[in-house]
């Protein structure tokens, strides 16, 4: 946290704290969310201003209950943050919007510096790990982001039972859709109700993945046990 703060970076989660999905790796509350707060974009923008941030990461819960998946508030939040904070750089870590390209396009048109969407795990493990998500649909999200000319970013966790070959294949899949920023971190079990850790991956293996990522053409690769999606986010702009 101190490292992020010293870099003038912080992460905000919008659209509430209750998710409509129940991924087996995530500690976010699940259930029926409260109505969306239409004043949230202004509140986030003011918070960024008061904290004198240089770079902000915005993420959200999944809002499959909303007709637009929360896309309008997503886009307005980006616009408001830029309006009140000239010179700020913004990364958005978005859900898949159920595969709705129009909803994703609203976020794209708000023009953040980076749009991130995490695969979270390899293709084989996706049904076990990610509630309602689809590996190929996530790749299509990233393809649409990259095709717009914005920087596309994704990340996975390891230690869930994947193989080295599957991790390398995932990198290849991401490069095929022109994703050029990639993060890898160790999965840690949030509670006994979540998926158990299958393996604590050795730091040497993380370094091997980092080198492989650059060899495959990623412009930025963060690969260490404690790396999370927003780690060193300000350096990816």
Residue ranges and their predicted role:
Residues 1-35, 55, 229-237:
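N-terminal [4Fe-4S]-dependent radical SAM core
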Residues 22, 66, 125, 192, ...:
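Glycine/Thr-rich phosphate-binding loops of Rossmann-like dinucleotide-binding domains
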Residues 14-15, 92, 223:
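Small/polar loops that bind or transfer phosphate-bearing groups
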Residues 11, 27-43, 50-101, 107-141, ...:
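Core AdoMet radical
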Residues 1-8, 42, 46, 52, ...:
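Auxiliary Fe-S-binding modules of radical SAM enzymes
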């Amino acid at each position: 946290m101190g490292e992020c703060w010293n870099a003038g970076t912080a992460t905000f989660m919008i659209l509430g704290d209750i998710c409509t999905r129940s991924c087996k790796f995530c500690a976010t509350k699940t259930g029926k969310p409260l109505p969306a707060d239409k004043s949230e974009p202004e509140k986030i923008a003011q918070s960024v201003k008061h904290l004198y941030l240089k770079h902000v990461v915005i993420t959200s819960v999944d809002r499959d209950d909303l007709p637009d998946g929360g896309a309008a508030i997503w886009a307005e939040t980006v616009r408001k943050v830029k309006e009140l904070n000239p010179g700020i750089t913004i990364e958005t870590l978005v859900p898949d919007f159920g595969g709705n390209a129009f909803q994703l396009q609203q976020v794209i048109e708000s023009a953040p510096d980076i749009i991130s969407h995490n695969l979270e795990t390899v293709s084989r493990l996706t049904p076990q790990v990610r509630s309602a998500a689809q590996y190929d649909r996530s790749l299509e999200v990233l393809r649409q982001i990259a095709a717009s000319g914005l920087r596309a970013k994704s990340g996975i966790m390891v230690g869930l039972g994947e193989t080295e070959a599957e991790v390398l294949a995932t990198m290849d899949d991401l490069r095929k859709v022109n994703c050029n920023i990639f993060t890898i971190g160790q999965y840690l079990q949030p509670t006994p109700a979540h998926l158990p850790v299958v393996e604590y991956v050795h730091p040497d293996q993380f370094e091997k993945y980092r080198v492989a990522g650059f060899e495959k053409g990623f412009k930025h690769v963060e690969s260490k046990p404690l790396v999370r999606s927003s780690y060193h986010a300000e350096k990816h702009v």
